[in-house]
Amino acid sequence: MAVETPSKIHNLIEEPIQQSLIRMTMPMIIGMIMLFTFSLVDTWFISFLGTESLTAISFTFPVTFTVMSMAIGLGIGASAVVASYLGASEPDKAKESATVINYISFGMACMIVLLCWTFMDRIFTLMGASDQLMVPIREYMNIWFPGSVLIVCIMTGNSILRAIGDTKTPSILMASAGFINAVLDPLLIFGLGPFPELGMQGAAWSTIIAWLIGFCYLTHLLIFRVEMVSKTLPSRSVFISAGKKMLRIGIPAAGANMMTPLAAGIMTAIAASFGGTIVAAFGVGARIEPIATLLVLAMSSSLPPLISQNFGAQRLDRVEEAYRLSIKFILGWQLIIYFILFLSSGFIAAIFSDDPEVIESIELFIWIMPLGYGLQGIIILTNSSLNAMHKPISALYLSIARFFVFYVPLAYLGSLYFGLYGFFCGAVCGNLLMGIISYRTFNEAIATEIRLDKSAA
């Protein structure tokens, strides 16, 4: 029997899985390109200010990505709850949950940002930033931190749109914001025309202005056009109930996502032991990675709504099929990406620096690290699938194991015995081991759900 859904909501329970994945992933690719080119464009323009400025912006990446990861995690919780209600044919509860989730995301963003801002100097000092580097770092982060609340709200709102099967609108929104950022960057960094020359601060202001415009548009869209967020605050009982469900998934998911920048911070500290030029090279490599794993990241946003709606409708066969199809495709795709990066490594390195040591280190990064991107894809898609199945603790355990049992420890051991080469190779080995563990974990989870479903029938 067909499941009835409102006209603005895509039915992901009956649409062919491959068709759903293609329809939802293609727009996400555009959105992801623009999202991650925010930092890449900033890095490129800032590189013209000199190696010191490039090194400073490289230090900010783990911290800025921590806030972004929290936003993504809360968005995962939002998407899982809303999509499950839609799959169970309860659109009213989906709207109530979406409304509550927006308020909670704003409140949590304010708390996390205030905490990070308060301990900013201590955080960057622990990462290995010198007193000299702290000057440009403060210039950038004192503007970026208060404005970052906007991106958390944008991420949550976009997740609600994806939960109803709409990945096109979030992609257009992020593409527009990315374009605005790219236009404003040279104007505010270098003071072109009537604009003031703000240097590092100009890059931060460009990003904040782009986010503000995107936030205003998205808020109007969710309330008045899509009508997935209510204009009035829900009752206390609804607020508590919906909030608990979202936070039960959102907090572990945010925690799991925040492992990534935390690990990146540790990896940056290890890179700092090789010298400032290596930090600059590692920072460039860290910004290339999201572009190289673009399809993985796009599918990590398009796959969960498909899984959540089918999980809510107890279509476990479709959940399993969607996961396996995604994994097979990602492994083949990332192999192609590796060869493209390998062949163009010299050209890519020369774009970001004219320092021979920095160029050599960027090339070494590109020759080794992308070998693990397909395996990293298995880990990311497994985590997003487990969250979509309302198993956030399993996803959190996998993230902890990946970063603090395999990825960072093996990279550190490699750096001790084989220098920079061992540092990169150790990280790839960590991804290999965790890719195997992640795949087995999903198989066990779906097998358990199938057994429970059969016993309940």
Where are these regions (language model features)?
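Short alpha-helical transmembrane segments in multi-pass integral membrane proteins
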Residues: M1-T25, V82-V149, F195-I251, I307-G372, ...
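Residue-level signal for short hydrophobic patches within transmembrane helices
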Residues: E14, Q18-T37, V41, V63-M70, ...
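Small-residue-rich hydrophobic transmembrane alpha-helices
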Residues: L54-L114, I151-P170, T268, A281-F339, ...
